[in-house]
């Protein structure tokens, strides 16, 4: 085996590294800070640590100017993210999340692009009660954010239930294995008695006292569906099914969507397949990959700290060699697989063992009641009688899963009663849309996303109808900033917020999530967006080959250049 010399980059540690170093395994002064009733906010050092506990301090940006005028502090509130490996939740857990959303949050539930629940608008004084109730529901927020392994994604594919069940178990085991071991979470939120420190005991055998240089994301896909966007993950596992059984996983490393506007040294990148492992080797592979990033990731410049930059700096071959050295065995050659799409399949689908699954379209992943659409109430009533489970999808939708044949009629009646929709009366474009939260709660947002994309799609749908493309599946994604929470540049049409009402527009991503999009127009508003799409969709309708996807067409037609690797994304 070729020998490589790996080194971590030079440079002083970032301020976040100092905060972690001084935190005593994520404790900091959080306990005292949360008991302080003078302010609804918390100091920045504690806010950095709060992420590891699954929460961010935010403020309502719609109210910011008015509160400044009144000489009031910002309308501080917390976002709480709940870890649900593989997006699977029991009906009892759904009911608990529903109750907490109405009792302590803003009355809505957000289903995220990583198959987790999010609460918005939780006040500081309600944080402890909320986290204790989440714990009582046998869920946790620990490591839902922060420089650790985040929620492990897993394909909730209702077509392959037997394989899904097995793959889900591996997702859950991965999640459990990579959870931080510190007791800080339990002491601060769950009133666990602090055990006297014993210096000879390693509190974090995998992470160490400094945890990882940056967030780390893992996802498992089951072909032909790439709904988890496996190539966007730091570590992706592609399930290989042979003769109806799970043979193992192809291993892909080094994906990540985030970048910084105007900084060409930052870029999105897709994970690359480096080999195959058996199911029982998955935990070992994941742990060793995480420790490589722990040891060689950039702890000086956070915007260069993701695993993708570690790989591009040191070389894929060097990282693979180091992985195999740490494993003590070599990965097998990658096995053939084929992805066909990265969207959801809506409505009723028959599974195995006489069970059924209903995939519900939830625009923007926002579960709430409106005057004409009692979505939250309907799901609450379904959860009261449902004997299967709920599966949050990576596209912010929901599968009412494992409905026994004898209960399908009852479930269907509830779906009809509350007008719950599979989205089939919407355009295929809308059904394949994805948006991050953005304004008013996200502190990083430069423009609207979740609140604006449905309105923009209303106008794009007119163009789609004019060109006979209503049932043509095209993925469209919007984020309020370039960080990539909605995996923006994997949308065939993508918008990244630049300033209020202005977006960078990207085209040319692959429908199956295997190619990044390319910058097409910079800093444009709605009028220009619609003008460009009128021309593009008209050309697509007239000039496309039979079965040709929109993302493939714009490259063949010379409208944008193909992105072959993240390192030439800006070329």
Swiss-Prot record:
GO terms for molecular function: 4 iron, 4 sulfur cluster binding; heme binding; metal ion binding; NADP binding; sulfite reductase (ferredoxin) activity; sulfite reductase (NADPH) activity. Keywords: 4Fe-4S, Amino-acid biosynthesis, Cysteine biosynthesis, Heme, Iron, Iron-sulfur, Metal-binding, NADP, Oxidoreductase. It holds the Pfam family NIR_SIR. [4Fe-4S] cluster binds at residues 436, 442, 481, 485. It comes from the Bacteria. InterPro entries: CysI, NiRdtase/SiRdtase_haem-b_fer, Nit/Sulf_reduc_fer-like_dom_sf, NO2/SO3_Rdtase_4Fe4S_dom, NO2/SO3_Rdtase_4Fe4S_prot, NO2/SO3_Rdtase_4Fe4S_sf, NO2/SO3_Rdtase_FeS/sirohaem_BS. GO terms for cellular component: sulfite reductase complex (NADPH). Siroheme binds at residue 485. It catalyses: hydrogen sulfide + 3 NADP(+) + 3 H2O = sulfite + 3 NADPH + 4 H(+). Its EC number is 1.8.1.2. Binds 1 siroheme per subunit. Binds 1 [4Fe-4S] cluster per subunit. One of its GO terms (biological process) is hydrogen sulfide biosynthetic process. Transmembrane segments: none annotated. Its cofactor is siroheme; [4Fe-4S] cluster. Pathway: Sulfur metabolism; hydrogen sulfide biosynthesis; hydrogen sulfide from sulfite (NADPH route): step 1/1. Component of the sulfite reductase complex that catalyzes the 6-electron reduction of sulfite to sulfide. This is one of several activities required for the biosynthesis of L-cysteine from sulfate. Alpha(8)-beta(8). The alpha component is a flavoprotein, the beta component is a hemoprotein. Belongs to the nitrite and sulfite reductase 4Fe-4S domain family. This is Sulfite reductase [NADPH] hemoprotein beta-component. It comes from Anoxybacillus flavithermus (strain DSM 21510 / WK1). The gene is cysI.
